[in-house]
A protein has these predicted regions:
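Leucine-rich repeat domain C-terminal region
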Residues: 191-248
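A structural signal for leucine-rich repeat
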Residues: 13-16, 34-38, 55-60, 78-82, ...
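Concave beta-strand-loop units of leucine-rich repeat
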Residues: 1-8, 18, 23-30, 40, ...
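C-terminal tail/sorting-segment detector
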Residues: 358-375
């Protein structure tokens, strides 16, 4: 039975004991579904009804697949769901989920639920789980050793997870998790890896011999502290994390067309007050409002394409944040040194061109700010 895009406020199917599949989806008024006598039911889909606050599953012992995404369910009693293999409860109001009797579960998707914890350690058949955006969960879930696929978008606690506990892990999706590092040595069997939008400055993927290069997503966004170099007031030093090897930076350039044409950028090791050499970028242009430049980092993982060996590169987009020096007042109003305009061909003028312009405001502290305008 399939009912989609309906206006039902309630549904009573107690007179249909032989039903094996029920799909009631996309209805904003439905508040109750009665399936008390549907003991043969194997598949139940009640996604996107939005008003359902509870489900009674106690008299459905043969249920194998339950999908109840996008409702208002606050609790889910699965004590009688011993045969459940697939559970999807995305975007509900669940704060806890007792899965202790669901020993046959293979796939769980509890994305966007306010769960405070999740224990799946006794679910030995579980291979796939998605707990993305479970923002109330402070600790990484307890998962079985045989888990193969983990999706945890916007889930910072993964930073403290020991992935070596899951030797069968082949797919990991952890975008936007605020990660500053990733230890690939703990998950050697990965085939697919998504670390998009984290804050990783250097990445070593050596040893991931099963990784499919077409299934690797690693663009990063980092913010570096910037400070004017003493006795070189026009130059800024941007401090890279110590684990960055400048020799592994394949290429780099400003993201702005005008900056690429008129400003310089280079890498340099410098010696700190403690005598230790550290990596940095040096620039004579600083834009504190946008991505300043991007660099491509070698990951030590190679693949063959069209008979040539290539290396997977990680794109890292860099923004700058001025570091207080104790001398300058960062809150003080900046003094404008001058304003210049550029057209699409890169021609410079003290006054705006007719049509599209890039306006570059230069300040006396060596920074600049650009914006697009139309005259």
């Amino acid at each position: 039975m399939v009912i989609d895009e309906h206006r039902l406020s309630s549904l009573d199917l107690r007179g249909c004991p032989n039903l094996k599949c029920v799909e009631v989806t996309n209805g904003g008024n439905l508040t109750s579904i009665q399936l008390d006598t549907c003991k043969k039911l194997e598949t139940f889909n009640c996604c996107a009804n939005f008003s359902i606050g509870s489900l009674d599953l106690l008299l459905m012992p043969n249920l194998k697949s339950l999908k109840c995404d996008y409702n208002k369910i606050e609790s889910l009693d699965l004590s009688a769901s011993q045969n459940l293999e697939t559970l999807s409860c995305v975007s509900n109001s669940l704060t806890r989920l007792d899965l202790s009797n669901c020993k046959k579960l293979i796939t769980i998707n509890c994305k966007k639920c306010p769960l405070t914890s999740l224990d799946c350690s006794q679910l030995n058949l579980l291979t796939n789980i998605d707990f993305s955006e479970c923002n109330q969960m402070e600790d990484f879930p307890k998962l079985p050793k045989g888990i193969k696929s983990i999706t945890c978008e916007r889930f910072p606690p993964i930073a403290n997870a020991d992935l070596s506990l899951f030797p069968d892990l082949t797919n990991l999706k952890a975008p936007y998790c605020e990660l500053k590092a990733f230890d690939a040595s703990k998950c050697r069997n990965l085939v697919s890896l998504n670390l998009w939008g984290n804050h990783i400055a250097a990445l070593d993927l050596s040893g991931l011999n099963h990784l499919d290069y077409k299934s690797v997503d690693t663009p990063q966004k980092i913010t570096l502290g910037a400070e004017r170099i003493p006795n070189k007031s026009s130059l800024w030093r941007l401090y890279l994390p110590e684990n960055v090897d400048l020799g592994k930076i394949y290429s780099y350039d400003y993201t702005d067309d005008v900056a690429r044409r008129y400003y310089s950028l280079y890498t340099e090791y410098f010696t700190g007050d403690d005598g230790i050499q550290r990596p940095s970028f040096v620039a004579n242009h600083l834009d504190l409002d946008n991505n300043l430049f991007v660099y491509n980092y070698k990951t030590n993982l190679f693949y063959e394409e069209e008979g040539k060996q290539k290396e997977i590169l990680m794109d890292v987009y860099v923004a700058a944040k001025q570091v207080p020096s104790g001398v300058e007042d960062l809150a003080a109003e900046k003094t404008v040194k001058g304003v210049v305009y550029y057209d699409l061909q890169g021609h410079e003028s003290a006054v705006p061109f007719s049509g599209f312009n890039i306006e570059v405001t230069q300040f006396t502290d060596g920074t600049s700010q650009s914006k697009k305008i139309i005259k």
